[in-house]
Amino acid sequence: MRHLITTKDFSNGEILALFKEAKEFLDEKPRTFLEGKSVTTIFFENSTRTQSSFETAARRLGAKVLKLDVSRSSSSKGETLFDTAANLDAMAPSAIVVRHKNSGVPHTLANYTHCPIVNGGDGKHAHPTQALLDLFTIMEHFDYNVKGKKIAIVGDIKNSRVAASNLELLPRFGIDITLVAPPHFMPNYPIKKTNKLKEVIDDVDIIMSLRTQTERHNIPTYASLKDYANDFCISKDLIKDKNLIILHPGPVHRNIDISDDVMADKRCKVLTQVKNGVAIRMAVLKKLILES
């Protein structure tokens, strides 16, 4: 049984095949590949973009979707996560998409179910479909000539599962990463690092801005988000007319992560990422369900 828990679960060749199929899915036309199949989504953390994206992807493939409302489920009444998984599995879904605040939950659930598990984000650990859609967006923009391209990942890297997955995936395709963050947001990771965004802005082809994850901070690290923005907001004054693209996994804190004028700039690919995300998740669900 194949699962997607981290980006390591797919080889480079499999990823390129996914991208080829995802490109076809960008036409947004309905398909029947998963007719008669069902996809269950169970999100123990709030999500608008990711959960909606997976549900849209499943429906476009012809699958039925069961969205489990965790706030009303038995898990909120004391049922263990594993009992919830066992009960879901008894309904014989074709795949389960799970998000949880604790790292490792999707991996553990894979031992209690008999269908593919797709990790929709677990703690600070991984968000594989986000990294796949980020790479797909980069690949499409640069016509798949990405070896040697340089990316700055900017912001709350230490607490970001998106960053963790991109740190695993992007170098596999020859993309050079520099981490840009204040010391308390910087992970202990053997890679190029700087605390000053202006030091790298002239050298990069891509900027990936990350949300400041205040919900994962035990104590405040800045007096205000405005103070953080003074050093790390992606603004027009910073990027000027440079030939680069800007990514963000969402939700964007406007004028904290990215300024309003940059959000409206054609170099900002945030909405392209959203569109690409549905296509990538269609390709992932099709692959895992039909190969299981």
From Swiss-Prot:
Pathway(s) this gene product operates in, as recorded in its UniProt entry = Pyrimidine metabolism; UMP biosynthesis via de novo pathway; (S)-dihydroorotate from bicarbonate: step 2/3
One GO cellular-component annotation of the UniProt record comes to:
cytosol
Gene3D superfamilies the UniProt entry points to = Aspartate/ornithine carbamoyltransferase
Q: Which GO terms describe its biological process?
A: 'de novo' pyrimidine nucleobase biosynthetic process; 'de novo' UMP biosynthetic process; amino acid metabolic process
Q: Which GO terms describe its molecular function?
A: amino acid binding; aspartate carbamoyltransferase activity
Q: Which UniProt keywords apply?
A: Pyrimidine biosynthesis, Transferase
Reported EC number(s) for this entry are 2.1.3.2
Q: Which residues bind L-aspartate?
A: 77, 161, 211
Quaternary context: Heterododecamer (2C3:3R2) of six catalytic PyrB chains organized as two trimers (C3), and six regulatory PyrI chains organized as three dimers (R2).
Query: Could you tell me what this protein does?
Result: Catalyzes the condensation of carbamoyl phosphate and aspartate to form carbamoyl aspartate and inorganic phosphate, the committed step in the de novo pyrimidine nucleotide biosynthesis pathway.
Designated name of the protein: Aspartate carbamoyltransferase catalytic subunit
Source organism per UniProt: Campylobacter lari (strain RM2100 / D67 / ATCC BAA-1060)
Q: What's the gene?
A: pyrB
